[in-house]
A protein has these predicted regions:
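RNA-binding accessory domains that recognize and position tRNA/RNA substrates
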Residues: 1-183, 193-239, 248, 280, ...
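A glycine-rich phosphate-binding loop feature that marks nucleotide/adenosyl-phosphate handling sites
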Residues: 48, 244-249, 291-292, 344-352
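Active-site adenylate/phosphate-handling loop in enzymes that bind or generate adenylated species
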Residues: 133-135, 172-179, 250-251, 255-333, ...
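Structural beta-sheet core signal
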Residues: 184, 208-210, 243, 288, ...
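Conserved G/P- and acidic residue-centered "switch" motifs that form tight phosphate/ATP-binding loops
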Residues: 189
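S-adenosyl-L-methionine
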Residues: 233-234, 238-261
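The feature marks non-catalytic terminal segments
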Residues: 337, 341-393
């Protein structure tokens, strides 16, 4: 029975004079998401509301699922609407709505009207009273409960009169692209895809970089990362994934540096490379999946040592999350099962038995000097052989 949806948003509604920019961005993201659905849709913005109208045959569940992946949407309301043909016609449509949507009439209800069009002959309270009376006349077994009703029937008087009672949760956040652009360090683990999803939820467009170490990491490990990027891209739109061959750099560091510092020094070079790619692609920050104390390279001292090599800000959305909190989100966004596939990435291959947990930055710098100019040549080679994959859901 539903052929239209009212799109609710939260934070966008409190924006000031630039609110229209966020609304326009949300409309753009909705149109992009619906391209993957069977059917044709008209997306329109009017009177501070966004509406999606199906203009052909469409799959209801598929459409809702697509809209639930659009950041900026807080709620999706399947609506029916009537032209303003008089109060009697509205009452007939409300009764038919109750009949079609709620087969069990042994329920409580409340009518919540909102009159945005001020020339409508009844005010909001009068609409509530009149429509409540119409429903009770049609279904005497129903009862009014203004505090905790089973059915909250919304009636909005705008260009048309919209009727809805269900609000399907959206992902919230802000439309992708309204918060700048950042480079995600994406591995095959649980954390980094979640970090990318979370920063994108705040409106940040993400590209990604993955450090590959053949033959120590397999093609299946690389494909796993591409698959994870595709899962995240279902929410963010296309992700430009940069695949960097890190093998020679890792082996050289392994040969020249103390093994208890391997992880930190390798991590510092990953950050250096990621920052260079970020600058080349107009990203204004880096994003990682680090969480304080989760592993040796994620103590506060280790994060200080990692940050030191970056001029761009490093965003860590998961910094205070427990592991199970991260797992819960990964299951929600459908990355968990892919993340736990048993294909190792370069961070798990070259791991010291007893990694330093409180690295001294001065000592780390001194050991990096032992790498001479050769490491700079390796870094440049890695950048020159960057494999770019455009990942789409």
């Amino acid at each position: 029975m539903f052929t239209a949806f009212l799109i609710k948003y939260a934070e966008i509604g409190v924006k000031g004079k630039n609110r229209y920019l966020f609304e326009d961005a949300l409309v753009k993201q909705i149109k992009y998401a619906l391209k993957k659905c069977d059917g044709e849709y008209a997306v329109r913005k009017t009177d501070g509301r966004i509406y999606v109208d199906a203009v052909s045959e469409f799959d209801y569940d598929e459409t809702v699922a697509a809209l639930q992946k659009v950041f900026g949407i807080s709620g999706i309301c399947p609506v029916v609407y009537v032209e303003d043909e008089g109060f009697e016609k509205l009452g007939e449509r409300v009764v038919r709505y109750i009949d079609e949507v709620y087969p069990d009439k042994n329920k409580t209800f409340k009518v919540a009207a909102r009159r945005a069009r001020k020339n409508y002959p009844l005010n909001s309270m009068e609409i509530n009273v009149e429509m409540g009376g119409v429903i009770l006349d049609a279904y005497p077994q129903m009862h009014v409960d203004v505090h905790k009703p089973d059915i909250l029937l919304n009636i909005e008087v705008r260009d048309k009169i919209y009727i809805y009672s269900e609000i399907i949760p959206g992902p919230g956040g802000m439309p992708v692209g309204t918060g700048g652009k950042a480079m995600l360090l994406l591995s095959g683990g649980i954390d980094s895809p979640v970090a990318g999803w979370m920063i994108a939820k705040r409106g940040v467009k993400i590209d990604a970089v993955y450090f590959h170490a053949p033959p120590y990491t397999s093609e299946r490990a690389k494909q796993k990362v591409v698959d994870l990027a595709r899962k995240v891209a279902a929410y963010t739109g296309p992700i430009y994934l940069h695949i960097i061959n890190f093998t020679d750099i890792q082996l050289y560091i392994y040969d020249k540096c103390p093994h208890d510092e391997l992880t930190i020094i390798m991590r510092r070079y990953m950050m250096r490379i990621a920052e260079q790619i970020a600058r080349q692609t107009d990203c204004i920050g880096l994003v990682t999946g680090e969480s304080i104390g989760q592993v040796a390279s994620q103590t506060m001292q280790s994060l200080v040592a990692t940050n030191e090599v970056c001029e761009l800000p490093v965003y860590r959305p998961l910094i205070a999350f427990d592991k199970m909190d991260i797992v819960d989100i990964s299951e929600k966004i459908d990355t968990y099962e892919t993340s736990i596939l048993p294909y190792e990435d370069c961070c798990t291959i070259f791991v010291a038995k007893h990694p330093v947990t409180k690295p001294n930055v001065n000592i780390i710098r001194r050991h990096e000097q032992n790498l001479s100019e050769k490491i700079d040549e390796m870094v440049q080679t890695a950048l020159d052989t960057d494999e770019l994959v455009i990942v789409q859901a």
